[in-house]
């Protein structure tokens, strides 16, 4: 195994079991747990032929580095979901749907965004190297397996990457509270890169200026903004809705 990583919790380990069980070196599980969820998990792991190691809570905490391990920790190969953005785009069938995060540095927010991206069928999450967080154990746990399925691509120059996407026919849509165009009036049916800024700060100036258009999420209550993962979900699933609508004959 050239490079390994920890998978912590039922969601992350189960996702890897389904995706590529052979890449799992070993799974540590809480020996004293006898509940149905653990029993079903152990059956799936044993059926996949993965090495299983019983452990007490203290050992699991030492391996995981946290008490929030749910009684399951795996050591597995670090998968490479995409080598670069060009390779990813070349392999996509149909119009790309990309989520771009500008300035999202909180691991819980990134994990939640990856989970939303997976649920919406987004092809990748893109972020600038200098204003992002890597896929660490917190991100992987919050993502509930999505860190194993959604390519996370970091780039050196985000504005340049957005221009390169535009050259490939991708429409870059940024989100801003003050944007005049309503999210639900925008066209998400073609190749789209949806750009989200950090909560409270929004997109950086150059990122904003590079976008083809800006949209806002209509807010009917008293709060002024949404968490970035919630806002990402609202926008991505509007794209899903538009792409799934069958034109009337």
UniProtKB/Swiss-Prot annotation:
EC number, as in UniProt: 2.1.1.185
Residues that, per the record, bind S-adenosyl-L-methionine: 197, 217, 226
InterPro entries associated with the record: 23S_rRNA_MeTrfase_RlmB, Alpha/beta_knot_MTases, Ribosomal_eL30-like_sf, rRNA_MeTrfase_TrmH, SpoU_MeTrfase, SpoU_subst-bd, tRNA_m1G_MTases_N
GO cellular component terms, A-Z: cytosol
Record's subcellular location: Cytoplasm
Pfam family for this entry, one: SpoU_sub_bind
Transmembrane portions of the chain: none
GO molecular function: RNA binding; rRNA (guanosine-2'-O-)-methyltransferase activity
The entry's keywords: Cytoplasm, Methyltransferase, rRNA processing, S-adenosyl-L-methionine, Transferase
Top EC group: transferase
Reaction(s) the record says it catalyses: guanosine(2251) in 23S rRNA + S-adenosyl-L-methionine = 2'-O-methylguanosine(2251) in 23S rRNA + S-adenosyl-L-homocysteine + H(+)
Role according to the record: Specifically methylates the ribose of guanosine 2251 in 23S rRNA.
Similarity comment text for this entry: Belongs to the class IV-like SAM-binding methyltransferase superfamily. RNA methyltransferase TrmH family. RlmB subfamily.
Protein name in the entry: 23S rRNA (guanosine-2'-O-)-methyltransferase RlmB
Organism: Ralstonia nicotianae (strain ATCC BAA-1114 / GMI1000) (Ralstonia solanacearum)
């Amino acid at each position: 195994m050239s490079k390994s990583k920890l998978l912590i919790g039922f969601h992350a380990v189960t996702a890897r079991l389904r995706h590529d069980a052979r890449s799992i070196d070993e799974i540590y599980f809480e020996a004293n747990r006898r509940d149905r969820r653990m029993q079903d998990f152990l059956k799936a792991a044993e059926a996949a032929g993965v090495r299983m190691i019983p452990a007490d809570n203290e050992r699991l905490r030492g391996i995981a580095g946290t008490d929030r391990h749910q009684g399951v920790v795996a050591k597995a190969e670090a998968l490479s979901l995409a080598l670069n953005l060009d390779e990813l785009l070349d392999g996509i069938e149909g119009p790309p749907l990309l989520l771009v995060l500008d300035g999202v540095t909180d691991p819980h927010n990134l994990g939640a965004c990856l989970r939303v991206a997976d649920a919406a069928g987004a092809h990748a999450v893109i972020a600038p190297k200098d204003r992002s967080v890597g896929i660490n154990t917190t991100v992987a746990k919050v993502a509930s397996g999505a860190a194993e399925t959604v390519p996370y691509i970091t780039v050196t120059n985000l504005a340049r990457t957005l221009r390169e996407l535009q050259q490939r026919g991708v429409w870059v849509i940024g989100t801003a509270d003050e944007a005049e165009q309503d999210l639900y009036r925008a066209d998400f049916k073609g190749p789209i890169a949806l750009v989200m800024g950090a909560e409270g700060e929004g997109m950086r100036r150059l990122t904003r200026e590079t976008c083809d258009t800006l949209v806002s999420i209509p807010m009917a209550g008293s709060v002024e903004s949404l968490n970035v993962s919630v806002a990402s979900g609202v926008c991505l699933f509007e794209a899903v809705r538009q792409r799934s609508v069958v034109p009337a004959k």
